Design a protein with these regions (language model features):
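C-terminal membrane-exit region of the final transmembrane helix in multipass inner-membrane proteins
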Residues: 358-392
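N-terminal Sec/SRP start-transfer signal
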Residues: 1-31, 41, 46-47, 320, ...
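Basic-flanked hydrophobic alpha-helices used for secretion and membrane insertion
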Residues: 124, 151-249
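Peri-transmembrane interface segments
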Residues: 36, 44, 190-193, 236-285, ...
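Hydrophobic alpha-helical transmembrane segments
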Residues: 16-20, 336, 356-364
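Hydrophobic, regular-secondary-structure patches
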Residues: 24, 28-110, 128-131, 136, ...
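Short beta-strand boundary microenvironments
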Residues: 110-165
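Transmembrane alpha-helical interface segments in multi-pass membrane proteins
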Residues: 279, 300-346, 361, 365, ...
């Protein structure tokens, strides 16, 4: 009977491909938009992910997310270091500073100042140079994307004049730029995770970063804390908060707090939610209507099977089998196309992160569409009179 159901399904090629196209479109749009949304929201706490050494981030109690900088006094670092259970506590500067390029243009940059001695808080991966090169005079490390795009230099001829229409030359080791009217020399190129902000990322020492920054009474952005071996991190966080009055959060908790801020105060979830819902509704409409029309066109065949003694349960199994076939094909094609899209977008600025949970949600959505389509068709078949096969 299942072979008969399969032959009925593929017999009408137009409706067969129509059902598959509807399910493929739904699976593609749900998977693609969900993966872009997840990738975009992951970027909101990308800086926390890149800074992997500390267990705890200490900050002003009013900080809402990682880029909401509310500076502390430098004396707070000593207070935190005095708390029992801490292996080390290091300062971190993070702020936007204007860079003056070779052509006279200005570019806002994310400047990160890390501990001068230990270099804790540095970039996750060095492409050129060494992290210790930051100890050189005026040394900075630039992320590779910023070096080849927004901080790139215009090529010049032998007379020193810019060459019109020529491709920009990526910033390289030895090149100089100005940060807040102070000289900085590139001593390394690093690779960092993409963040929600699009500005180039520049690493330097904490002391040098505070000289680049505009003069303020408070310049300490965060305190990075590592717990002693065997120390409960949650308990240490509470101890820091009690002793200092500051907010102390584990890495994951700080990431979640940042993620929740963007979920609550931006329109990103609504925009992507509408796109996913649209894909689901369009897929349901196309697949459901086409599958129902397919069933109507085959009522005489179902009636003949019923006249030959096929039970309603057997007919139900045939319809569910047909729904399973088109569901698996549509799901596979949709997810496959979304995965190819993700591979092509991997080296672009587009965020795309495909998780197994996304595949599960897409599978559940396609299953629901197939079951709904099969149920609508099943009602017609269950009410079918075998005598219809003998009419006109």
């Amino acid at each position: 009977m299942y072979s008969v159901a399969f032959k009925m399904l593929v017999g009408d090629r137009a409706k067969y491909f129509g059902i598959i196209m509807g399910l493929t479109f739904a699976a593609l749009l749900i998977t693609q938009q969900s993966s872009i949304f997840i990738g975009l929201m992951t970027r909101t706490f990308g800086f926390i992910t890149d800074t992997s050494q500390p267990d705890i981030w200490v900050m002003d109690p009013k900080v809402q997310f990682v880029d909401d900088i509310k500076p502390l006094q430098d004396t707070e670092l000593l207070r935190v270091r005095g708390v029992d259970g801490i292996e080390w506590a290091m300062p971190l500067y993070k702020g936007l500073i204007r860079a003056r390029l070779e052509n006279g243009n200005f570019q806002q940059c994310n400047v990160v100042g890390i501990d001068d001695a230990t270099m804790i808080g540095g970039p996750p991966e060095m492409v050129e140079g060494s992290l210790s090169d930051l100890r050189r005079a005026d040394g900075v490390i630039v992320d590779e994307v910023g070096a080849r795009t927004r901080l790139a230099r215009m090529p010049r001829d032998q007379a020193g004049n810019p060459i019109p229409g020529a491709a920009p030359v990526p910033l390289k080791i030895g090149d100089a730029l100005e940060l807040n009217d102070k000289r900085a020399v590139v001593v390394g190129i690093c690779r960092v995770g993409r963040t929600f902000q699009s500005q180039p990322v520049i690493y330097t020492t904490y002391t040098r970063a505070t000289t680049f920054a505009p003069r303020e009474r408070k310049l300490l952005s965060f305190i990075l804390v590592k717990a002693k071996p065997g120390q409960d991190i949650g308990e240490l966080s509470r101890r820091i908060e009690v002793n200092t009055g500051l907010r102390a959060m584990e890495k994951w908790d700080f990431s979640v707090k940042t993620y929740q801020y963007f979920m609550k105060y931006t329109g990103i979830p609504i925009n992507f939610g509408i796109a996913v819902a649209l894909g689901f509704l369009v897929g349901t409409a196309i697949a459901g209507q086409t599958f129902y029309n397919f069933t109507l066109d085959n009522l005489r065949h179902f009636g003949a099977l019923k006249a030959m003694g096929a039970s309603n349960m057997r007919l139900l199994g045939m319809i569910l089998f047909q729904a399973l076939i088109v569901g698996l094909i549509g799901y596979g094609l949709g997810v496959g196309l979304a995965s190819c899209f993700g591979l092509l977008a991997g080296r672009t600025e587009l965020s795309f992160r495909l998780l197994w949970q996304t595949l599960a949600v897409t599978g559940g959505a396609i299953t629901f569409i197939c079951m709904l389509s099969a149920t609508i068709s099943l009602v017609k078949v269950m009410r079918l009179e075998p005598a219809i096969v003998f009419k006109g």
